[in-house]
Curated annotation (Swiss-Prot):
The modification Phosphotyrosine is found at Y106. It comes from Mus musculus. This is Tripartite motif-containing protein 29. CDD domains: Bbox1_TRIM29, Bbox2_TRIM16-like. It comes from the Eukaryota. Residues 259-348 form a coiled coil. One of its GO terms (biological process) is negative regulation of transcription by RNA polymerase II. Interacts with VIM and HINT1. Interacts with IKBKG/NEMO. Interacts with STING1. Pfam families: zf-B_box.
Length: 587
């Protein structure tokens, strides 16, 4: 294209854009001004690299290639226009467009006359939008100056998961045309990502020495301040948020700020400490899991032994019941045999009597057959002289006590069931209802010995906040009553009115300087005296022996050393007055 003046820009650097209008066929500008005779410049909007003496494509001779591109005889120079679009994910990208819609061999390049107004870009910090697309207004949270913005550090954040998921995708080079290559670095100054080929100017050129190269970044807008549109290069330690340099002088004025690199190093140290603590906790949990696996085996073995004992005892019980049953059965059989023997004796006696009666009957039948009357009478007289009536048959009564035996056995069964149920209920409720595993009352690594030695005597005093009332209760004699010093109001705690009271309370023994409780609006820390930290407005300025800071001893990094006990860093120190009234010696 002869004498063409093309300019490529993505809007990242407004200074690099060339706002000149395309020249007409005669070589003059469309607005009538004189054409610029300087060399054409091609500006890379991503890297800011400007090369002189180069044009888009090869130069066309006069009259060549015109008929191939345009059907009419009118020669119109190409108009290159960049359109910025925003997709659903909020990512910005640029494309080239023209009025007639003819596409060049290059991706996004359109040739033809432009009937649309030129692309205009907003000022820095404002959202740049395309006039060829529907306007998309971003949702920006307006924060008033001085308003505190704190991070809550949630355990699981969907935005963090989305960023991690998007970060796993490949970042493409912004300078490649057509087949985009994978980006290897991103430049914060150019706000673009480059592949190995397009990264060479940043590595070799002297103009790009000050450019900061990072790992490929997908969303550069996330690194910009939502209020000012500048890159967030600072970190506010007061509000725990990333800010730009304009925020440091406006919303975060007089706040403690550091660079994001320093804040990252500090947070990485904190993160490493948390990882070590989590690793120690994981090791502790794994040890507990191993211990509980052994306990599970012990529980199974113990339960198996208990089942064996149960089976053995109930087998013995059933065997004893079988013995008792056999004894009752033997008694029944013995009684049956005795009764049968008695019946046999009775039957034998009756058979003997029946035999005698049969003999008497036969004698009388023989006498009845005598035909001689004299002989019959003589024999009859002799028979009747010894005759007597047969005695009556003996009577017997059989006692069948089956119902009585059944009632006795029923009572025995009820008694056995009652005794068995009573013992089984006792075993189930008293012995078997107790769980194998019982949760301890002291948890979270608490010092059991320390807590047990004092909670029994002070009740619920451990829930008292860090105020003067909490620590003043320990300033009384160790053996006396635990009466805390409670002033009526903080304003009465002045040095003039309470100096005498504190001297009487603490004593004057030793070389300690008398100090009293003072009410201050803010907690003031002193290097030589301990102070009570927290939400309290009181600062403790007592004797050095009244409160001491426990410095933990250096221990090797083992899983046991990670267990911190309750009140291991800051414990109240009791005063032992001893025999003297004014003594404040340490025990």
């Amino acid at each position: 294209m002869e004498g063409a003046d093309a300019c490529r820009s993505n809007g990242a650097s407004p200074e690099a854009r060339d706002t000149r209008s395309p020249p007409g066929p005669s070589g003059s500008l469309e607005n009538g001004t004189k054409a610029d005779s300087k060399d054409t410049k091609t500006t890379n909007g991503h890297s800011g690299e400007v090369t002189e003496g180069k044009t888009l494509g090869s130069a066309l001779k006069s009259g060549e290639g015109k008929s191939g591109l345009f059907s009419s005889n009118e020669w119109r120079r190409p108009i290159i226009q960049f359109v910025e679009s925003v997709d659903d994910k909020g990512s910005s990208y640029f494309s080239m467009d023209s009025a007639e819609g003819r596409r060049s061999p290059y991706a996004g390049l359109q040739l033809g006359a432009s009937k649309k107004p030129p692309v205009t870009f907003a000022e820095k910090g404002e959202l740049r939008k395309s006039i060829f697309s529907e306007p998309r207004k971003p949702t920006v949270t307006i924060v008033e100056p001085g308003e505190v913005r704190r991070n809550s550090y949630p355990r699981a954040d969907s935005s963090l998961l989305a960023r991690a998921k998007s970060g796993s995708e490949e970042v493409l080079c912004d300078s490649c045309i057509g087949n985009k290559q994978k980006a290897v670095k991103s430049c914060l100054v150019c706000q673009a990502s480059f592949c190995e080929l397009h990264l060479k100017p940043h590595l070799e050129g002297a103009a790009f020495r000050d450019h900061q190269l990072l790992e490929p970044i997908r969303d550069f807008e996330a690194r910009k301040c939502p209020l000012h549109g500048k890159t967030m290069e600072l970190f506010c330690q007061t509000d725990q948020t990333c800010i730009c340099y304009l925020c440091m002088f406006q919303e975060h004025k007089n706040h403690s700020t550091v660079t994001v690199e320093e804040a990252k190093a500090e947070k990485e140290t904190e993160l490493s400490l948390q990882k070590e603590q989590l690793q120690l906790k994981i090791i502790e949990i794994e040890d507990d899991v191993e211990k509980w696996q052994k306990e599970k085996d012990r529980i199974k073995s113990f339960t198996t032994n208990e089942k064996a004992i149960l089976e053995q005892n109930f087998r013995d019980l059933v065997r004893e019941l079988e013995k008792q049953k056999e004894e009752v059965r033997a008694a029944l059989e013995q009684r049956e045999q005795d009764a049968v023997d008695q019946v046999k004796v009775i039957v034998d006696a009756l058979d003997e009597r029946a035999k005698v009666l049969h003999e008497d009957k036969q004698t009388r039948e023989q006498l009845h057959n005598i035909s001689d009357s004299v002989l019959f009478l003589q024999e009859f007289g002799a028979l009747m002289s010894n005759y007597s009536l047969p005695p009556p048959l003996p009577t017997y009564h059989v006692l069948l006590e089956g119902e009585g035996l059944g009632q006795s056995l029923g009572n025995c069964k009820d008694d056995l069931l009652n005794v068995c149920m009573r013992h089984v209920e006792k075993m189930c409720k008293a012995d078997l209802s107790r769980n194998f595993i019982e949760r301890n009352h002291m948890e979270n690594g608490g010092d059991h010995r320390y807590m047990n030695s004092y909670t029994s005597s002070y009740g619920n005093e451990w829930s008292t906040p860090d105020t003067m009332k909490r620590y003043s209760m320990y300033l009384t004699p160790k053996g006396g009553g635990r009466t805390s010093y409670q002033p009526s109001s903080p304003s009465r705690l002045s040095k003039e009115t309470n100096q005498k009271n504190f001297n009487n309370l603490y004593g004057t023994k030793g070389n300690y300087t008398s100090r009293v409780w003072e009410y201050t609006s803010t907690v003031q820390n002193s290097e030589d005296m301990p102070t009570v930290q927290g939400n309290s407005s009181f600062s403790l300025k007592g004797f050095p022996s009244l409160l001491r800071s426990q410095v933990p001893k250096a221990q090797p990094q083992t899983w046991k050393s990670g267990k911190q006990t309750l009140l291991s860093h800051y414990r109240p120190f009791y005063v032992n007055k001893g025999s003297g009234i004014g003594s404040n010696e340490a025990p």
